[in-house]
């Protein structure tokens, strides 16, 4: 785009939402639920512009090191780890799908823990701190590829249905011409060009596609049913 970019690190999901709302950030990479929180906090002005093609069909993986666990029903009476409480793929959507399968984590599991991060969930399960856990598929694949998880010990036993997840969101009061420029720059990224592929590889993206607010209505409904949104 030719624009100067200043990277602003944030401490957690809530800080990203607040920074967008208070105009400290113009553009942010958000999980689906964090986007919904940003939309609510900014009175509907935060705009999702693009997502990776993979984010339109995102999934989470349920993992275990316990040979007795083969299905979600086997989780009854077991210890379980989610990621961060407000993580779309590490907590909210897996919880929603568990409930659709008739499982209430707080009632049906022996204990429920929050590891705080996807890779930490794998560590919990590998170390026996939890009988099973759930994390986003992208992180699981990355850990497997980099041999940071022993797949002879920790294995996937279930996968969620697909849902929309991560996106790049802009604050809505940015100049529309700048928003269009940013969106077009993402959509123009071509993996056949090495300099473009280097950028895309950082986000494990095969390509970027346009997205819109209504794609996240399902996540908003899941957040309300979980009591995480008013």
Annotate each PLM feature.
Residues 20-21, 75, 125-126, 182:
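Hydrophobic residues within well-ordered alpha-helices
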